[in-house]
């Protein structure tokens, strides 16, 4: 079944490091040369908090797969010392020590890594750990990009925290250029009504608050359940049929999942499926708010544009 494993982690969402010790200067004479204190490093996280470091992060822990991908995109993968289960991209991330899962990170195991920066996602899940890190003087940065445009911004901010601006800046600009190209290419195209399949048994979807809907908008797609009151509502088959989507979009783990989805929707009588308009995109790329979502958006735009062809 597609997206069953990805759904909980993808939609559940909806501290400063100590500075240099102050030395006793009372015995200093006028001849003692002054030592310039390095300027603190600042970056605003996705909760609007100012995160401050005394020096670039060199022992960071990520608590979400997308955060790991963002760190690597910022050129700072070498400075990760641990992550969570499921944080598997890029391949180098699979060699990192695992300190639990994203919903219940183990504070003791995290503290044992001697981190100087925690990159978290869900405040509710990270709160107990954040309290421990606060006592230890370890900064916590919350990463939760809500739009495609926020992804390159996140890469740049992480570059600041790690001191890898020389790598992060060009990476962010490349992502922006690709997004700008999509916006220019698909602006004004005929709208395509899309059902976002976040689960099939039972049926779940995503509303406008999801970053997937932002990708749809970029491609000229219209989320047929965009106005749902919650981010990931369960919906009935009758509601999907009544919405009359032109296409179905689902995150998949393997190409065979798309064929199974197509067969399932055909059996349920969805006209879009009868026309073959059921599309699958790698679930991790589609649902993680990281750099690979730009890849997913490019594929999505191309899929929807083929549907527009006579």
Language model feature labels by segment:
Residues 2-66, 164-196, 247, 302-310:
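Bacterial Sec-exported substrate-binding components of ABC uptake systems
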Residues 40, 49-50, 116-117, 121, ...:
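Extracytoplasmic substrate-binding proteins
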Residues 44-48, 99-108, 124, 228-237:
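Short helix-initiation/N-cap motifs at beta->coil->alpha
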Residues 58-113, 117-122, 224:
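A short, structured surface patch at a secondary-structure boundary
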Residues 64, 122-123, 198, 228, ...:
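Short secondary-structure boundary segments
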Residues 107-114, 136, 235-244:
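Short helices/loops that flank or line small-molecule/ion binding pockets
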Residues 124-135, 247-264:
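A ligand-binding cleft/hinge motif common to bilobed small-molecule-binding domains
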Residues 209-232, 252, 277-280:
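His/Asp/Glu-enriched short active-site or ligand-binding loop at hydrolase and phosphoryl-transfer sites
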């Amino acid at each position: 079944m597609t997206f069953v494993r990805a759904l909980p982690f993808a939609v559940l969402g909806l501290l400063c490091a100590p500075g240099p010790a102050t030395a006793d200067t009372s015995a200093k004479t006028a001849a003692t040369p002054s030592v310039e204190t390095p300027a603190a490093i600042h970056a605003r996280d996705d909760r609007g908090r100012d995160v401050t470091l005394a020096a670039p992060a060199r022992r960071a822990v990520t608590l979400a797969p997308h955060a790991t991908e963002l760190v690597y995109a910022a050129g700072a993968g070498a400075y990760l010392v641990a992550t969570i289960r499921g944080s598997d991209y890029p391949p180098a991330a699979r060699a990192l020590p695992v300190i639990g899962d994203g919903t219940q990170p183990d504070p003791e195991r995290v503290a044992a890594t001697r981190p100087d920066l925690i990159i978290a996602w869900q405040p509710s899940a990270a709160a107990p750990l954040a309290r421990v890190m606060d006592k230890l003087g370890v900064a916590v940065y919350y990463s939760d990009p809500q739009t495609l445009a926020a992804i390159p911004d996140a890469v740049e901010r992480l570059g600041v925290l790690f001191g890898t601006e020389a790598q992060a800046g060009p990476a962010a600009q490349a992502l922006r250029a690709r997004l700008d190209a999509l916006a220019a290419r698909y602006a004004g195209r005929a709208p395509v009504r899309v059902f976002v399949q976040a689960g099939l048994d039972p049926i779940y979807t995503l509303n406008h608050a999801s970053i997937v809907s932002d990708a749809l908008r970029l491609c000229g797609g219209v989320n047929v359940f965009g106005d749902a009151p919650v981010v990931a509502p369960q919906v009935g088959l009758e509601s999907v049929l009544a919405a009359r989507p032109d296409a179905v979009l689902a995150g998949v783990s393997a190409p065979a999942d798309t064929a199974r989805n197509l067969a399932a929707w055909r059996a349920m009588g969805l006209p879009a499926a009868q026309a073959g308009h059921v599309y699958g995109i790698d679930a991790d790329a589609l649902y993680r708010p990281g750099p690979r979502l730009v890849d997913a958006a490019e594929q999505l735009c191309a899929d929807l544009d083929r549907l527009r062809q006579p």
